[in-house]
């Protein structure tokens, strides 16, 4: 079954109502998902992306009912991951010589998944275009690490449709295809969940890439994503949201999560939350047991929060395993502009709290004092927990607590405005800031470190070259992204 998108563009993807786990079991898809593939019929027939490999045969059968496969002139693969390009083997068996347009990195990924190096690959880079007839072109825009090195977007001129790949999407299945046809609250919840759990580590690149795309001054009438709905009504709303979420996002919200063997740490969490509420009744407070709640919901709440409290009983002098796993996830997501504190109960040693505090510091949180309670907290210990909550509420307040609360309490900063005309993403050069000659620089995407003492001989950057003198054409050896995603870092702190 196909769905008309616009003019000669049709959706030919696959809905997946049943899927509940994505990326292995790392992402819970309670609302299902869709694998969006698009068929363009102009002077040339173009297929943009396929579907997940488990639907390969069904996809090709449905596509053959829509169009004579032999008349497909080009296949465009925006992303090589199996939920996008999974049906390629089944499809290319039917049309083996058809050109496949993708990035250089995608050729490696596609070949690694499908083991067909003989396919007719045509690598593209940002600014390359493909004439599809009737005065229309496809323009390609590389988006490395959003969220794979091979990722790109495709823009269709005249129709002004941006096929955005994973960006601006959501794991959300609905019989309706367009954003104006579905529940808006549910939709935005899934968009934020998707960003928080998948794209947060790449926020600096999100901002740079959106500004680069806007700098082309191309009109956008629709954003056709790879998962979930197509943005037809006011498509710039999701672009604005991404700019907001990428800008050290926080709300006036505090999240507590914990694990407990005997409910002692749970009692502490409840008391701390009570203390926060006593001092700042307007702040949103949520409590989660990591052993019982949806991990991705907790991570989304962490993304939204100005501060978090992480609690654990001590077991074998370390934290509970599920708390440790959650902190590993949080470290990888690289949240910014957030405060944190550890708490927990113990019997004879209290190693869990100290280890949590260290992990939170390593993850980039602004650390506040921690709290321990021995054995089951009594009335005095619970009073101490409530006082701890009161102190944190005062320290973490986004507004004077003795003044009337602002009307808009959920946002720490106003949403950014869409630039009227934006130039290409700014380069992190000496013009923007002056660095010491020995200043190391950290790639915020892959964590590779540029050490001036070592330089980067593979790119003809000699040892002893300060960052300000590194050419603007420099690309991170770890992820292939430019200087705009680097930030200062002490060498000893980065290695």
UniProtKB/Swiss-Prot annotation:
Name of the featured protein: Anaerobic nitric oxide reductase flavorubredoxin
Binding sites annotated in the UniProt record for Fe cation 2: 83, 166, 227
UniProt organism field: Aeromonas hydrophila subsp. hydrophila (strain ATCC 7966 / DSM 30187 / BCRC 13018 / CCUG 14551 / JCM 1027 / KCTC 2358 / NCIMB 9240 / NCTC 8049)
Alphabetized PANTHER family for the sequence: ANAEROBIC NITRIC OXIDE REDUCTASE FLAVORUBREDOXIN
Pathway assigned in UniProt: Nitrogen metabolism; nitric oxide reduction
UniProt: Fe cation 1 binding residues: 79, 81, 147, 166
GO function term, MF aspect, one: iron ion binding
Family the UniProt entry places it in: In the N-terminal section; belongs to the zinc metallo-hydrolase group 3 family.
């Amino acid at each position: 079954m196909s769905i008309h998108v616009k003019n000669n563009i049709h959706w030919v993807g696959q809905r997946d109502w049943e899927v509940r786990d994505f990326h292995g079991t790392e992402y819970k898809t309670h609302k299902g998902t869709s694998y969006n593939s698009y068929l363009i019929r102009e002077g040339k027939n173009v297929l943009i992306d396929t579907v997940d490999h488990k639907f390969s045969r069904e996809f090709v059968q449905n596509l053959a009912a829509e169009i004579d496969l032999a008349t497909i002139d080009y296949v465009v693969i925006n992303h090589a991951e199996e939920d996008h390009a999974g049906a390629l083997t089944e499809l290319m068996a039917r049309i083996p010589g058809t050109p496949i347009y993708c990035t250089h990195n995608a050729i490696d990924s596609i070949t690694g998944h499908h083991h067909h190096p003989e396919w007719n690959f045509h690598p593209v880079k940002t600014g390359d275009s493909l004439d599809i007839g009737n005065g229309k072109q496809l323009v390609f825009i590389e988006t490395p690490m959003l969220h794979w090195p091979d990722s790109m977007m495709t823009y269709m001129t005249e129709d002004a449709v941006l096929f955005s790949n994973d960006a601006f999407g959501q794991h959300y299945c609905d019989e309706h295809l367009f954003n104006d046809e579905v529940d808006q609250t549910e939709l935005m919840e899934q968009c934020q969940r998707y960003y928080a759990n998948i794209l947060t580590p790449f926020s600096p690149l999100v901002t740079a890439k959106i500004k680069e795309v806007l700098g082309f001054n191309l009109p956008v009438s629709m954003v056709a994503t790879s998962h979930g709905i197509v943005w037809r009504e006011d498509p710039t709303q999701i672009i604005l949201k991404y700019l907001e979420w990428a800008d050290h996002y926080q709300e006036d919200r505090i999240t507590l999560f914990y694990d407990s063997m005997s409910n002692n740490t749970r009692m502490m969490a409840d008391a701390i939350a009570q203390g926060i509420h006593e001092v700042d009744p307007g702040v949103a407070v949520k409590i989660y047991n990591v052993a019982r709640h949806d991990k991705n919901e907790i991570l989304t709440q962490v993304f939204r929060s100005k501060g978090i409290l992480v609690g654990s009983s001590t077991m074998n002098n370390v934290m509970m395993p599920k708390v440790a796993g959650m902190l590993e996830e949080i470290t990888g997501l690289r949240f910014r502009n957030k405060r944190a504190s550890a708490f927990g109960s113990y019997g004879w040693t209290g190693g869990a709290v100290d280890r949590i505090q260290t992990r939170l510091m390593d993850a980039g949180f602004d650390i506040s004092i921690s709290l321990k309670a021995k054995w089951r907290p009594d009335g005095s210990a619970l009073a101490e927990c409530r006082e701890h909550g009161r102190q944190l509420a005062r320290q973490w307040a986004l507004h004077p607590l003795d003044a009337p609360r602002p009307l808009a309490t959920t946002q720490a900063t106003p949403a950014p405005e869409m630039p009227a005309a934006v130039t290409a993403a700014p380069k992190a050069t000496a013009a923007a800031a002056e660095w010491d000659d020995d200043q190391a620089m950290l790639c915020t995407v892959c964590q590779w470190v540029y050490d001036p003492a070592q330089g980067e001989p593979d790119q003809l950057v000699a040892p002893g070259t300060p960052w300000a003198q590194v050419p603007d054409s420099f690309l991170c050896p770890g992820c292939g992204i430019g200087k705009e995603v680097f930030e200062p870092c002490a060498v000893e702190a980065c290695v």
